[in-house]
Amino acid sequence: MTVLKMTDLDLKGKRVLIREDLNVPVKDGVVKSDARILASLPTIKLALEKGAAVMVCSHLGRPTEGEYSEENSLKPVADYLSGALGREVPLLGEYLDGVKVEPGQVVLFENVRFNKGEKKNADELAQRYAALCDVFVMDAFGTAHRAEGSTHGVARFAKVACAGPLLAAELEALGKALDNPQRPMAAIVAGSKVSTKLDVLNSLSQVCDQLIVGGGIANTFLAAAGYKVGKSLYEADLVDTAKAIAAKVSVPLPVDVVVAKAFAESAEATVKAIDEVADDDMILDIGPQTAAQFAELLKSSRTILWNGPVGVFEFDQFGNGTKVLAEAIAASPAFSIAGGGDTLAAIDKYGVGEKISYISTGGGAFLEFVEGKVLPAVAVLEERAR
């Protein structure tokens, strides 16, 4: 994968437009989770150090296109950036007809989704973005799977289009895990439905040595192996699909599980052997014996890709499986990459973030890359680098 990188460019005196993913949760005008903003700071700081006039843009939420809405304004993000950078970061509402930014200055453009044509990737809007800058930097891996005006269109028309450090690091880490992984490779894919992760499971079954499944996905694989899953969430129509995947790659199944009679925070947890699941049981986590076996697998792996918690970890009595696996990944010498919103929440909860080689900032983009799909915003950077 060959793309031009911002780190290789001379930006002195240049007008640089950086597309970041600053789509963060905001409540009552205050940023509630700053992870994406923190991830973008090194890129913004580097552009300033290189002497660029810096313009930053992003979307936030899903406003009605072409209409301003206060709840989707980037004002709280501008305030946060001002504090984080130790300088005022003005929020510009009107910018499509040109802005005055001096080298060493940084401004934030208001939500790109307030602009008509953003989601449809309209050429006219993309050309207006491109006219604002000498160099366009795509740094938002989290939106790289969407062909929109500020992620894809602008890269077609800008004088120079390159990948920012955050995007470049994501592509490098994912490439390392998927293109030429050190063996043995283990993948953990968990979630409520096989149907939503079918492409991920199929793709990983061709690259990994061990495919650990969890959540509702594991229940479908258990049913495929002839076990009773009681009232657990599973997809009867995908049992044959699960069998086909299990025929291609080693899918270790739980030997014990944690069950409850109801899906509730107050539900009583009971550990049962896999062949003792009753008709009115719901499987809500892997059991301690299974967690220990899977942990050993992970500790002996050299590449680990993790997407999804293996139990309902939001309820502590069903969180042990995810906790044990998270700690095993952290203790493993493997190159480990983790992605997906629930996975990041689990990493935070169990405090293992420092020990995971790479934590992806992209949810949908992470999954599409793992599926082997082309990310439009990356493809256009490759075209421009030719």
Swiss-Prot record:
Q: Does the keyword Kinase apply?
A: yes
Annotated residues that bind substrate are located at: 21-23, 36, 59-62, 113, 146
Query: Which Gene Ontology BP terms does the record give?
Result: gluconeogenesis; glycolytic process
Write down the species: Azotobacter vinelandii (strain DJ / ATCC BAA-1303)
Query: Know the name of this protein?
Result: Phosphoglycerate kinase
Which Gene Ontology cellular component annotation is one that this UniProt entry carries? cytosol
Task: Give the binding site residues for ATP.
Answer: 197, 314, 340-343
List localization entries: Cytoplasm
Q: Does the keyword Magnesium apply?
A: no
